[in-house]
């Protein structure tokens, strides 16, 4: 049972790291909160040009 918990923790950590790196590659600024970045990515279909608190601009 402990090994299952360990695998789940590793998966959560890897998923979090991947999502953070994905947000940085779609143009989300460092000062853009994760919640705001998620909204921008959904709104712009992952084509985010500018992401700041309260500001979300899509590219193309």
From Swiss-Prot:
Amino-acid biosynthesis keyword on record: no
Compartments (UniProt record): Secreted
Species whose genome carries this gene: Lychas mucronatus
Signal peptide annotation: 1-28
Keyword entries, A-Z: Disulfide bond, Ion channel impairing toxin, Neurotoxin, Secreted, Signal, Toxin
Coiled-coil ranges (or none): none
Protein name: Potassium channel toxin alpha-KTx 29.3
Superkingdom: Eukaryota
Tissue expression notes: Expressed by the venom gland.
Family as reported in the entry's similarity comment: Belongs to the short scorpion toxin superfamily. Potassium channel inhibitor family. Alpha-KTx 29 subfamily.
Major place of residence: secreted
Record has Signal as a keyword: yes
Cystines in this chain: 32-51, 40-56, 44-58
Domain notes: Has the structural arrangement of an alpha-helix connected to antiparallel beta-sheets by disulfide bonds (CS-alpha/beta).
One GO CC annotation: extracellular region
Function: Weakly inhibits the Kv1.3/KCNA3 channel (1 uM of thetoxin inhibits currents by 13.2%) and Kv7.1/KCNQ1 channel (10 uM of the toxin inhibits currents by 27.7%).
């Amino acid at each position: 049972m402990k090994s299952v918990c360990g695998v789940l923790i590793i998966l959560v950590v890897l998923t979090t790291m991947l999502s953070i790196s994905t947000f940085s590659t779609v143009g989300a600024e460092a000062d853009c909160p994760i919640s705001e970045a998620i909204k921008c990515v959904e709104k712009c279909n992952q084509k985010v040009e500018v992401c700041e608190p309260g500001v979300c601009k899509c590219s193309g």
